[in-house]
Amino acid sequence: MIEFKTKPFDYQLDGIEYGRHNNRWLLADGMGVGKSLQAIYIAQINKEKYNWKHCLIVCGVNSLKYNWYNEVNKHTDYSAYILGTRYKRSGAVKAGSTKEKLEDLLKIDELPYFLITNIESFRSVDFANKIKNLCKNKIKMVIADELHACKNPASQQAKGFLKSNPDYKLAMTGTPLMNSPLDLFIILKWLGYENHSFYQFKQHFCVMGGFGGYQVIGYKHMEQITDTLDMMMLRRVKEDVIDLPDKMYIDSYVDMLPKQKTLYYDIVQQIQEDIDKVILSPSPLASLIRLRQCTGYPGILSTSVNESAKLDKMEEIVKEAVSNGEKCVVFSNWTNVTKEVCNRLKEYNTATITGEVKDVDRTEQEKKFMEEDACKVIVGTIGAMGTGLTLTAGTVVIFMDEPWNSALFEQAVDRTHRIGTTKKVTVYSIMCKDTIDERIHELIYQKGKISEILIDGVKEKNKTELVNFLLS
């Protein structure tokens, strides 16, 4: 009888039992349900039942390496090791190079059961081939976390990762479909449920059209995707298995300040003058980023315009929340916006996590927010702080700007709304009235419908309609 160091919830025991009888599957429980504990205990069972030598955890998001390291130590008596770990003279941990990771794999028999690396390691052909060979006898189980983040089948890391073929494969994601069924291809391919090429997969499930017939304008045969997922996916959402406090969503609208408004419409005019170039560009949304930045913090774009209605509103929300004994989590898409947020919130002993913060320091910032009473606010980018962290000390979440899709939005919110949450979470989306902010707010909920894998042939707006919609 296996003894667990941390007692799982009943639904987690169900997941562990499912994993005992399936060796190629997708654990797609919603954010905050506790997927990592289930995966760790399945690996522990396999170790103690079959005397397997190693389980490799591959992180689709690099910063998750340290979360997994802490989770293994927290929930088991086994040790974990991040491949390539080396120390500076100061004692600080430094990220390992491919050479150092390969050196570690040469002495794999001396390493602990749980090995951890990031998906980018597989960009190295030597590393990918080494893992492929080790999967024959040493590495009998691979856990691939946030595998949906590996989207491009033509990339070197995808090709390298797909070579790994251990006895037991467990893919994990809280968001099995982000923007389209194409995001599932690598997951299905690795688990052995898809034998066709990416081109064939795309032709079968996508409706092609638009300029030259190369644009995906919709989806078809979605019932086949659903049937496949039913065979190999276990998914429970928080609302079904955990009695958590409610989430309250508040759309907070502000009017742009005079100079801010002038700059905004100057940018709109510039875009409209080059509208054909924008529409024909590979990524028209990128051309509109300046508008989004202007509604957040115009100082990114102009040395003479620093006023921001959204920043003023954010300060107001934080001040009220902190006075009521609450902690706040503030998100933005852009590091420059987070820096200005931090400048305005210095009095709250702010923690921060952006792409500029080293992975090893992110855990310290997370710990600061969770454990220090004096730290009232944590500020970060959606890309760096929106996954893999537990921020349940926060009960107020503020979006200075929203991501392009609803899955990323909910993923970020669920840093606070997960196991351990004891209070209601209030989520503010601050938007400038009559601007691109409102249009994106509408857009992410429209795209969210696609992510539910329910409707056959949902059509996306073509580029012209999309740009005109966002500028309207």
Tell where the protein language model's regions lie, with residue ranges.
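Conserved P-loop NTPase motor "coupling/switch" region that bridges the ATPase
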Residues: 53-54, 74-80, 86-103, 107-110, ...
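Conserved Helicase C-terminal RecA-like lobe
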Residues: 1, 30, 34, 38-50, ...
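Conserved pre-motif I regulatory segment
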Residues: 1-28
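Inter-lobe coupling linker of SF2 helicases/translocases
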Residues: 116-122, 128-138, 151, 156-167, ...
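Conserved Walker A/P-loop ATP-binding site and its immediately adjacent core
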Residues: 52-74, 180-183, 333-334
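SF2 helicase/translocase ATPase core recognition
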Residues: 164-201, 241-268, 376, 380-462
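Conserved motor-coupling elements within RecA-like helicase/translocase cores
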Residues: 92-115, 361-376
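Conserved helicase motor
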Residues: 83-100, 119-124, 149-154, 332-336, ...
